[in-house]
């Protein structure tokens, strides 16, 4: 960036003691504990086959239905009800099974396309293309409030590359801040 651009960035990033800044709205809870706010991201971590996808399905079902699902509660504003669910590891058949599970948990019919849930299977794409697809989907989806990414490591060519990891996390921070969404 040029010096002029840096000056603009500094101005944009300045925090003043006299300004009023709104607290990020809580949108995801487990019981009464906040686990997600708009403008931020969270993660489910665990060993392979430790039911992370099932756990995330319950989060998606709660956000989709507005009800408590397996102790998860969600409170997305009216203009933030759209969910984008991205799976980087599984093919379309498996993703469809996850989609049906989410709909069952949300007590919604699994023979009708849900209005507020978009699922993408990105297994066949290269890591860089996956990231670009997600960026485009986030940018063009109106009323987006929640983005679930199952398989964040698949955005990286080298899981041990700190520069690649920093680049992906920086994108997440940019998207959550610019779009005021929650990424999980």
Model features per residue range: what roles?
Residues 27-28, 117-119, 183:
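Hydrophobic beta-strand residues in large extracellular and virion-surface proteins
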Residues 1-3, 140-141:
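C-terminal regions of RecA-like/P-loop NTPase motor modules
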Residues 2-101:
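The Walker A/P-loop phosphate-binding site
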Residues 54, 163-166:
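Conserved structured core elements
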Residues 166-184:
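Substrate-engagement module of ASCE P-loop NTPases
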Residues 77-160, 167, 174:
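Conserved inter-motif catalytic segment of the P-loop NTP-binding fold
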Residues 44, 148-150, 180-184:
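Structural recognition of the conserved hydrophobic beta-strand(s) that form the central parallel beta-sheet
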């Amino acid at each position: 960036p040029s010096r002029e651009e840096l000056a603009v960035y500094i101005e944009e990033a300045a925090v003043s003691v006299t300004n009023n800044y709104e607290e990020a709205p809580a949108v995801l809870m487990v019981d009464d504990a906040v686990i997600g706010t708009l403008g931020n991201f969270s993660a489910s971590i665990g060993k392979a086959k430790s039911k992370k996808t099932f756990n995330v399905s319950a989060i998606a079902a709660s956000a989709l239905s507005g009800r408590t699902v397996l102790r998860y509660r969600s409170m997305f504003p009216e203009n933030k009800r759209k969910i984008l669910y991205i799976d980087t590891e599984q093919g379309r058949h498996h993703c469809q099974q996850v989609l049906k599970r989410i709909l069952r948990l949300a007590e919604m019919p699994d023979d009708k396309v849900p209005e507020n849930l978009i699922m993408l299977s990105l297994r066949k794409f290269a890591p860089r293309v996956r990231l670009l697809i997600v960026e485009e989907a986030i940018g063009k989806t109106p009323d987006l409030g929640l983005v679930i990414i199952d398989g964040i490591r698949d955005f990286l060519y080298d899981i041990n590359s700190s520069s690649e990891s920093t680049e992906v996390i920086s994108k997440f921070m940019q998207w959550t801040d610019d779009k005021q969404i929650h990424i999980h």
